[in-house]
Protein backbone atom coordinates (compact mmCIF):
# COMPACT_ATOMS: atom_id res chain seq x y z
CA UNK A 1 0.00 0.00 0.00
CA UNK A 2 1.36 3.36 -1.08
CA UNK A 3 1.61 6.00 1.65
CA UNK A 4 1.69 9.80 1.63
CA UNK A 5 5.23 9.56 3.00
CA UNK A 6 6.38 7.55 -0.03
CA UNK A 7 4.77 10.06 -2.39
CA UNK A 8 6.41 12.94 -0.48
CA UNK A 9 9.86 11.33 -0.79
CA UNK A 10 9.46 10.80 -4.54
CA UNK A 11 8.18 14.36 -5.07
CA UNK A 12 10.67 15.98 -2.69
CA UNK A 13 8.00 17.71 -0.63
CA UNK A 14 6.63 17.30 2.88
CA UNK A 15 3.91 14.81 3.81
CA UNK A 16 1.78 17.81 4.73
CA UNK A 17 2.13 19.22 1.20
CA UNK A 18 1.13 15.86 -0.30
CA UNK A 19 -1.90 15.71 1.98
CA UNK A 20 -2.93 19.25 1.06
CA UNK A 21 -2.50 18.54 -2.66
CA UNK A 22 -4.51 15.32 -2.46
CA UNK A 23 -7.29 17.12 -0.60
CA UNK A 24 -7.41 20.05 -3.04
CA UNK A 25 -6.17 22.67 -0.59
CA UNK A 26 -5.55 26.00 -2.35
CA UNK A 27 -2.23 26.78 -0.64
CA UNK A 28 -0.22 24.33 -2.79
CA UNK A 29 1.31 25.54 -6.04
CA UNK A 30 -0.98 24.18 -8.81
CA UNK A 31 1.94 22.65 -10.77
CA UNK A 32 3.25 20.96 -7.61
CA UNK A 33 -0.22 19.69 -6.73
CA UNK A 34 -0.69 18.22 -10.22
CA UNK A 35 2.74 16.53 -10.07
CA UNK A 36 1.88 15.04 -6.66
CA UNK A 37 -1.50 13.76 -7.91
CA UNK A 38 0.16 12.25 -11.00
CA UNK A 39 2.75 10.41 -8.90
CA UNK A 40 -0.04 9.20 -6.60
CA UNK A 41 -2.06 7.94 -9.60
CA UNK A 42 0.97 6.25 -11.15
CA UNK A 43 1.74 4.48 -7.87
CA UNK A 44 -1.88 3.39 -7.40
CA UNK A 45 -2.37 5.41 -4.22
CA UNK A 46 -5.71 4.98 -2.49
CA UNK A 47 -6.64 7.04 0.58
CA UNK A 48 -6.82 5.07 3.82
CA UNK A 49 -10.10 5.89 5.58
CA UNK A 50 -8.86 4.48 8.90
CA UNK A 51 -5.74 6.67 8.83
CA UNK A 52 -7.82 9.69 7.86
CA UNK A 53 -10.20 8.99 10.73
CA UNK A 54 -7.34 8.78 13.24
CA UNK A 55 -5.93 12.09 12.03
CA UNK A 56 -9.20 14.04 11.74
CA UNK A 57 -11.14 12.36 14.59
CA UNK A 58 -13.99 11.95 12.07
CA UNK A 59 -15.18 8.83 10.27
CA UNK A 60 -17.11 10.58 7.50
CA UNK A 61 -19.81 8.00 8.18
CA UNK A 62 -23.45 8.89 8.88
CA UNK A 63 -25.70 6.25 10.38
CA UNK A 64 -29.32 5.96 9.31
CA UNK A 65 -31.81 4.21 11.57
CA UNK A 66 -34.69 3.14 9.34
CA UNK A 67 -37.20 0.49 10.41
CA UNK A 68 -39.51 0.35 7.36
CA UNK A 69 -39.05 -1.32 3.98
CA UNK A 70 -36.57 0.58 1.83
CA UNK A 71 -39.05 0.46 -1.05
CA UNK A 72 -41.46 2.73 0.90
CA UNK A 73 -42.01 5.41 -1.77
CA UNK A 74 -41.73 8.51 0.43
CA UNK A 75 -38.79 7.32 2.51
CA UNK A 76 -37.01 5.85 -0.52
CA UNK A 77 -36.91 9.38 -1.93
CA UNK A 78 -35.74 10.78 1.41
CA UNK A 79 -33.01 8.11 1.64
CA UNK A 80 -31.94 8.88 -1.91
CA UNK A 81 -31.63 12.58 -1.04
CA UNK A 82 -29.65 11.76 2.12
CA UNK A 83 -27.32 9.51 0.13
CA UNK A 84 -26.74 12.08 -2.63
CA UNK A 85 -26.09 14.91 -0.17
CA UNK A 86 -23.77 12.74 1.91
CA UNK A 87 -21.78 11.73 -1.17
CA UNK A 88 -21.50 15.37 -2.27
CA UNK A 89 -20.05 16.21 1.16
CA UNK A 90 -17.63 13.24 1.22
CA UNK A 91 -19.62 11.09 3.65
CA UNK A 92 -20.70 7.46 3.49
CA UNK A 93 -24.04 6.15 4.75
CA UNK A 94 -24.48 3.13 7.00
CA UNK A 95 -27.73 1.55 8.17
CA UNK A 96 -27.83 1.26 11.95
CA UNK A 97 -29.15 -2.08 13.18
CA UNK A 98 -29.39 -4.05 16.40
CA UNK A 99 -26.60 -6.45 15.50
CA UNK A 100 -23.28 -6.76 13.72
CA UNK A 101 -22.97 -10.26 12.31
CA UNK A 102 -24.07 -12.58 15.10
CA UNK A 103 -23.42 -10.02 17.84
CA UNK A 104 -26.47 -8.28 19.29
CA UNK A 105 -25.95 -4.67 20.27
CA UNK A 106 -28.07 -1.59 20.81
CA UNK A 107 -28.55 1.03 18.09
CA UNK A 108 -26.33 3.36 20.11
CA UNK A 109 -23.59 0.74 20.53
CA UNK A 110 -23.69 -0.09 16.82
CA UNK A 111 -23.38 3.61 15.93
CA UNK A 112 -20.51 4.07 18.40
CA UNK A 113 -18.84 0.81 17.27
CA UNK A 114 -18.81 2.10 13.69
CA UNK A 115 -17.70 5.55 14.90
CA UNK A 116 -20.56 7.37 13.17
CA UNK A 117 -20.14 11.13 13.03
CA UNK A 118 -23.91 11.39 13.47
CA UNK A 119 -27.15 9.46 13.04
CA UNK A 120 -30.38 10.22 11.23
CA UNK A 121 -33.39 8.54 12.86
CA UNK A 122 -36.35 8.07 10.54
CA UNK A 123 -39.36 5.77 10.39
CA UNK A 124 -38.44 4.12 13.69
CA UNK A 125 -40.40 2.97 16.71
CA UNK A 126 -39.68 6.17 18.61
CA UNK A 127 -40.83 4.75 21.97
CA UNK A 128 -38.40 1.79 21.70
CA UNK A 129 -35.87 2.05 24.59
CA UNK A 130 -32.97 1.53 22.16
CA UNK A 131 -34.16 4.42 19.98
CA UNK A 132 -34.57 6.58 23.10
CA UNK A 133 -31.05 5.60 24.22
CA UNK A 134 -29.61 6.59 20.83
CA UNK A 135 -31.50 9.90 20.81
CA UNK A 136 -30.25 10.70 24.33
CA UNK A 137 -26.61 9.86 23.51
CA UNK A 138 -23.75 12.29 22.87
CA UNK A 139 -23.88 11.54 19.14
CA UNK A 140 -25.24 14.28 16.89
CA UNK A 141 -28.77 13.14 16.01
CA UNK A 142 -31.29 14.38 13.45
CA UNK A 143 -34.82 12.99 13.75
CA UNK A 144 -37.35 13.03 10.93
CA UNK A 145 -41.02 13.62 11.81
CA UNK A 146 -40.60 13.21 15.56
CA UNK A 147 -39.31 15.38 18.40
CA UNK A 148 -36.74 14.21 20.94
CA UNK A 149 -35.49 16.72 23.49
CA UNK A 150 -31.96 17.80 22.65
CA UNK A 151 -32.11 16.55 19.04
CA UNK A 152 -32.55 18.43 15.80
CA UNK A 153 -35.91 17.52 14.24
CA UNK A 154 -37.05 17.88 10.65
CA UNK A 155 -40.83 17.91 10.53
CA UNK A 156 -43.25 17.50 7.66
CA UNK A 157 -46.33 19.72 7.78
CA UNK A 158 -48.87 17.04 6.81
CA UNK A 159 -51.89 19.32 7.36
CA UNK A 160 -50.58 22.01 5.01
CA UNK A 161 -49.66 19.32 2.48
CA UNK A 162 -53.18 17.86 2.55
CA UNK A 163 -54.74 21.33 2.14
CA UNK A 164 -52.50 21.93 -0.87
CA UNK A 165 -53.44 18.56 -2.38
CA UNK A 166 -57.18 19.17 -1.91
CA UNK A 167 -56.90 22.63 -3.50
CA UNK A 168 -54.92 21.18 -6.40
CA UNK A 169 -57.41 18.35 -7.06
CA UNK A 170 -60.38 20.73 -6.71
CA UNK A 171 -58.68 23.16 -9.08
CA UNK A 172 -58.40 20.39 -11.66
CA UNK A 173 -62.21 20.12 -11.66
CA UNK A 174 -62.47 16.91 -9.64
Which residue ranges define each predicted feature?
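Alpha-helical recognition/docking segments in bacterial nutrient-uptake
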Residues: 2, 61-167, 171
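Short, flexible coil/linker segments at domain boundaries that flank nucleotide/cofactor-interacting
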Residues: 57, 172-174
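N-terminal helix-turn-helix DNA-binding module of bacterial transcription factors
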Residues: 1-60
